[in-house]
């Protein structure tokens, strides 16, 4: 890889890392190409970026984007995106289904996060799911009132 290619990769990563709310670093050693393609497709559907890159290049991009403190060892695959939940869910779900895939560390909300935080975020409902729950709670009293009125109407009609 030439120096200009490395500079280009660093610039591209730096731009992505600056705009991201979450970066998850995972071990992918032993995964087949088919499984990696499955991860990329799933990530693409959820607006999550995935890239395998040398640790030195990733470290430079992370430092340039102001996200320091991640300890990078061995071979890593990086997942990042603007939505913390999407990134966490993609990584955690893929780890559940693949023994050879392992979440190592993450950078979430401006700080280094451990695996437990990534998995906890992955279990949280998405914004749309939360809105649906909220609407259900708001509609419950009206629904119960309507059911009560219909029951009263049916009782009056039967008398």
From Swiss-Prot:
Q: Which GO terms describe its biological process?
A: translation
List the GO terms this entry assigns under cellular component, sorted alphabetically.
large ribosomal subunit
Keyword set for this entry?
Ribonucleoprotein, Ribosomal protein, RNA-binding, rRNA-binding
Say if the entry is tagged with keyword Protease. Answer: no
Q: Does the keyword rRNA-binding apply?
A: yes
Q: Which Pfam families match?
A: Ribosomal_L10 (PF00466)
- Could you tell me which HAMAP family the record lists for this protein? Ribosomal_uL10
The subunit field of the Swiss-Prot or TrEMBL record says:
Part of the ribosomal stalk of the 50S ribosomal subunit. The N-terminus interacts with L11 and the large rRNA to form the base of the stalk. The C-terminus forms an elongated spine to which L12 dimers bind in a sequential fashion forming a multimeric L10(L12)X complex.
Q: Which NCBIfam families match?
A: PRK00099.1-1
Q: What name does UniProt use for this protein?
A: Large ribosomal subunit protein uL10
User: What organism, scientifically named, is this protein from?
Assistant: Campylobacter jejuni subsp. jejuni serotype O:6 (strain 81116 / NCTC 11828)
* Lineage start: Bacteria, Pseudomonadati, Campylobacterota, Epsilonproteobacteria, Campylobacterales
């Amino acid at each position: 890889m030439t120096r200009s290619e490395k500079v280009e990769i660093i610039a591209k990563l730096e731009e992505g890392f600056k705009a991201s709310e979450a970066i998850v670093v995972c071990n992918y050693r032993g995964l087949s190409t088919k499984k990696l393609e499955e991860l990329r497709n799933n990530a693409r559907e959820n607006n999550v970026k995935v890239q395998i890159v040398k640790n030195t290049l990733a470290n430079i991009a992370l430092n340039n984007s102001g996200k320091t403190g991640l300890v990078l060892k061995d071979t890593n695959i990086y997942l990042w995106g603007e939505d913390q939940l999407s990134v966490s869910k993609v990584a955690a779900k893929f780890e559940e289904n693949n023994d050879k895939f392992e979440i190592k560390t993450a950078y979430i909300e401006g700080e280094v996060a451990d695996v437990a935080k990534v998995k906890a975020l992955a279990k949280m409902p998405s914004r749309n799911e939360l809105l649906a729950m909220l609407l259900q709670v708001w509609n419950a009293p009206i629904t119960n009132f309507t059911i009560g009125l219909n029951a009263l109407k049916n009782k009056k009609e039967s008398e």
